[in-house]
Amino acid sequence: MKPSIILYKTLPDDLLHRLEAHFTVTQVPNLHPETVARHAQAFASAQGLLGASETVNRALLEKMPALRAASTISVGYDNVEVDALTARKIVLMHTPAVLTETVADTVMALMLATARRVVDVAERVKAGEWTESIGPAWFGVDVHHKTLGIVGMGRIGMALAQRAHFGFTMPVLYHARRRHQEAEDRFNARYCDLDTLLQEADFVCVILPLTAETRHLFGATQFARMKSSAIFINAGRGPVVDENALIAALQNGEIYAAGLDVFEQEPLSVDSPLLNMSNVVAVPHIGSATHETRYNMMACAVDNLIDALQGKIEKNCVNPQAAG
C-alpha cells in the first residue's frame, strides 16, 4: 500500500501525477482547523505534507500522528514550528537553491526602480503630467559605481553581489554571521560590522530570514545611521524591519527611498502610509514569482517529499537531526 500524504497546494498535472505514482494523495485547500476536521481520517493517516504559506504548528501536528515529513514550496519556513516537528522526528524539507537567481533579479529590479524612480515617473506619464521636456523634479540617481551593502551573504546575497560587481561596477560591503571568503575573492566584497555598512552604503539590501535574532533588526537607530541619500531594500522577511520606524525615516528624509518586497503584515494594508509615498516601490512578495521558478520550486518540493519518505535527506533538509 502506498503511503498517504496531504497536498495543500494546487500543482501542475505532471507534478501531481509524479506524487500519485508514489503516494495516495488527499488534496485540501488549506490547513485551517475546519479543513483538518473535515478530512480528519486523511490527516490522521498521512505520512507526508506538502504545500506553501500555511501555518504548520503543534495543534496541526496533534492531528497528524503518522506524519514523517513535511515539504514546503519555499526557502523560508518561519510559518513552521520547526522545534515541534523535530521533537516528533518529522523532517522539514525546503527549496533553497532553485529560486536564488530569480530573487536576486528581483532585488536588482527594486534597486533600479527606486534609484531611477521608474514607478513614480511611469505613473506620472500615465496621469498626463508629461507635457514638456522633463527637469530635475523627474530625475533619479545613478546605480552604477555606488556602494552596495548586503546584509545576509547567503546564496541570494552572492547572486546579488555578482550582478552588482560585474554588471554595475559597484563596490560591495557585506555583513553576515561569518565571513564569506568566496564573496571576498570573487567580488572583492568587504566584510564589516552592521554600523559601518549602514554608514557607508548607498544601497542597503536586506536578505535575511526571520529569526528571534533578526526580528526588528532594523529600527529607528539603524535608519538614523544611514546616509540621507541611501536607498533601503528589503527582500528577506518583513518583520526583520520595524515598519513604523521605516515609515518615519522616509517621512523625515533620513533615507532617500525604499524598495520593498516583504512587509510586517502581508498583504500590506491599503491604509499603509507606504502606499502614499512616491519614493517607495512596494511589490507583493514577488521575489521568486516567475512561471519558471515557481514551477521549479514545486518540482523540487515534490522530489524532496519523495526523497524524505524514502529516508533520503542529504539535501534541502532544515532539521536533519529529526531523522536521527
From Swiss-Prot:
Compartments (UniProt record): Cytoplasm
A GO term from the CC aspect: plasma membrane
An example Gene Ontology molecular-function term: NAD binding
Leading EC class: oxidoreductase
Catalyzed reactions per annotation: glycolate + NADP(+) = glyoxylate + NADPH + H(+); (R)-glycerate + NAD(+) = 3-hydroxypyruvate + NADH + H(+); (R)-glycerate + NADP(+) = 3-hydroxypyruvate + NADPH + H(+)
Record EC number: 1.1.1.79, 1.1.1.81
Residue spans crossing the bilayer: none
Disulfide bonds: none
InterPro entries cross-referenced by the UniProt entry: D-isomer_2-hydroxyacid_DH, D-isomer_2_OHA_DH_cat_dom, D-isomer_DH_CS, D-isomer_DH_NAD-bd, Glyo/OHPyrv_Rdtase_B, NAD(P)-bd_dom_sf
SUPFAM superfamilies xref list: Formate/glycerate dehydrogenase catalytic domain-like, NAD(P)-binding Rossmann-fold domains
Active site: 237, 266, 285
Annotated HAMAP family: 2_Hacid_dh_C_GhrB
Annotated function: Catalyzes the NADPH-dependent reduction of glyoxylate and hydroxypyruvate into glycolate and glycerate, respectively.
NCBIfam families: PRK15409.1 (NF011938)
Name listed for the protein in its UniProt record: Glyoxylate/hydroxypyruvate reductase B
